[in-house]
Regions:
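Active-site-proximal specificity loops/subdomain of glycosyltransferases
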Residues: 45-90
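Short, well-formed alpha-helical segments that are part of the catalytic scaffolds
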Residues: 16-29
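Short, hydrophobic beta-strand segments that form beta-sheet elements in well-ordered domains
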Residues: 33-42, 96, 119-121
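Short, charged, surface-exposed secondary-structure boundary motifs
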Residues: 17, 61-70, 128-134
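GT-A fold catalytic core of metal-dependent nucleotide-sugar glycosyltransferases
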Residues: 79-130
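Short, polar loop motifs at secondary-structure junctions
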Residues: 39-46, 58-59, 103-106, 213
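A glycosyltransferase accessory/donor-loop signature
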Residues: 1-9, 18, 38, 48, ...
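Catalytic phosphate/metal-binding cores of nucleic-acid and nucleotide-processing enzymes, i.e., regions
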Residues: 43, 117, 145-146
Length: 272
């Protein structure tokens, strides 16, 4: 039984996703002692050499987006629509597909492999700043459909695992239809929405029957800054409104995985 981590990393005009994935892959080797396969393209590689296993695929655009909501001028192409290929491209029997901005900082993900379920992801997130910025992401669309996160997606090579990614491909190919059905904007393709809808179909639309990773995913929004203090210790900087006044705060993250959405701050850490 082989186990490993899968990361999709297609760079664009603004962010070198492949470089970030390579940095995260090093941390996977250190803290999980697992092999990593990165799905990318020749444009992202750009003549460079990487020590981790690379599989080439044509990048599929999910649309244009601003990669930092708090600033203008960070609009680029979001090549985020290849996730449905995970089942066919993964060389492992059991796989955890993670985003390139998921900072592996412990061995906690190893617990996911112990699950009896063949497909798992996070339903809940925990804002590590305490500002509750992710509350609006608990549901999506006018029908308030439950929001599941594609950031960490575990699957086994099994009948159910295969069906999950077949459903994801179907939802991706018919994204406009599903955006109309679930009443959300279809301008940008979101893997979270694709995973959420696919899980619902997979479990016969019985939402209470959908199993999830049994802990909330620590996360930070794209207006949070980051500094690495040592191997497992990071300092985050952010503003928080107290008594109607915005004030600067700092917190320490130590020995805990976290989803860090500010790609530009993550890039500074990688090059520090």
């Amino acid at each position: 039984m082989t186990r490993g981590i899968l990361i999709f990393a297609f760079s664009n005009e603004k962010i070198d996703y492949l470089e970030q994935a390579d940095w995260v892959a090093d941390r996977v080797n250190t803290y999980l002692d697992l092999p990593v396969t990165i799905i990318t393209d020749t444009k992202s590689i750009n003549g460079r050499k990487f020590k981790h296993n690379l599989i080439l695929s044509d990048a599929i655009s999910g649309g244009q987006r601003n990669f930092k909501h708090t600033e203008e001028g960070n609009v680029g192409t979001w090549y985020n629509s290849n996730r449905f290929q995970s089942y066919n491209l993964s060389p492992y029997d059991e796989t955890i597909a993670i985003d390139s901005d998921y900072v592996v900082n412990s061995d906690q993900l190893l617990r996911v492999f112990e699950s009896k379920h063949d497909v798992l992801c996070h339903r809940d997130v925990y804002d590590i700043t305490g500002t509750n910025r992710f509350a609006p992401y608990n549901t999506f669309g006018k029908h308030k459909f439950p929001h599941y996160w594609a950031t960490v997606l575990f699957f086994r090579k099994s009948k159910m695992g295969k069906e999950m990614f077949q459903l994801m491909e179907m939802v991706k190919d018919n994204y406009t239809h599903y955006s109309n059905l679930y009443k959300f904007s279809g301008n940008i393709m979101r893997n979270d929405f694709i995973v959420s809808i696919s899980l619902s179909i997979l479990y016969g639309h019985k939402l209470d029957a959908i199993p999830t990773i049994p802990w909330a995913m620590p996360s930070a929004y794209d207006d949070v800054d980051l500094e690495q203090l040592d191997d497992t210790k990071f300092k985050i900087s952010y503003t928080k409104t107290t008594n109607g006044e915005k004030k600067p705060y700092k917190s320490i993250i130590n020995g805990t995985d976290f989803h860090f959405i500010n790609k530009f701050a993550l890039d500074k850490v990688i090059h520090a």
